[in-house]
């Protein structure tokens, strides 16, 4: 059986609103931290979302 290569992560808003998205990524192919521009509905703007650990 194959190992589960994908790990669940949390993308947290850099605007400090507390809003976050959850997603998964392959740790083997992308070991660096993920940073994406996504929509923050709290402030109604696109902001940078940075990867944090999902607890």
Curated annotation (Swiss-Prot):
Q: In what ranges is there compositional bias, type Polar residues?
A: 14-24
Q: Which InterPro entries match?
A: Ribosomal_bL33, Ribosomal_bL33_CS, Ribosomal_bL33_sf, Ribosomal_zn-bd
Show the segment(s) annotated as Disordered. 1-29
Biased composition regions of type Basic and acidic residues, renumbered to the chain: 1-11
Q: What PROSITE patterns would the database entry show?
A: RIBOSOMAL_L33
- Keywords attached to this entry: Ribonucleoprotein, Ribosomal protein
| Pfam (any one) | Ribosomal_L33
Q: Which GO terms describe its cellular component?
A: cytosolic large ribosomal subunit
Q: What's one GO BP annotation on this UniProt entry?
A: translation
Give GO MF terms, alphabetically: structural constituent of ribosome
Disulfide bond sites: none
PANTHER family in the cross-refs: 54S RIBOSOMAL PROTEIN L39, MITOCHONDRIAL, LARGE RIBOSOMAL SUBUNIT PROTEIN BL33M
Q: What does the sequence similarity comment in the record state about its family? A: Belongs to the bacterial ribosomal protein bL33 family.
Protein name per its UniProtKB record: Large ribosomal subunit protein bL33
């Amino acid at each position: 059986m194959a190992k589960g290569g994908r790990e669940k992560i949390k993308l947290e808003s850099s605007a400090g609103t507390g809003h976050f998205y959850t997603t998964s990524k392959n740790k083997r192919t992308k070991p660096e931290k993920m940073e994406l521009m996504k929509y923050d509905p709290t402030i109604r703007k696109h902001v940078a979302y940075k990867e944090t650990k999902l607890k």
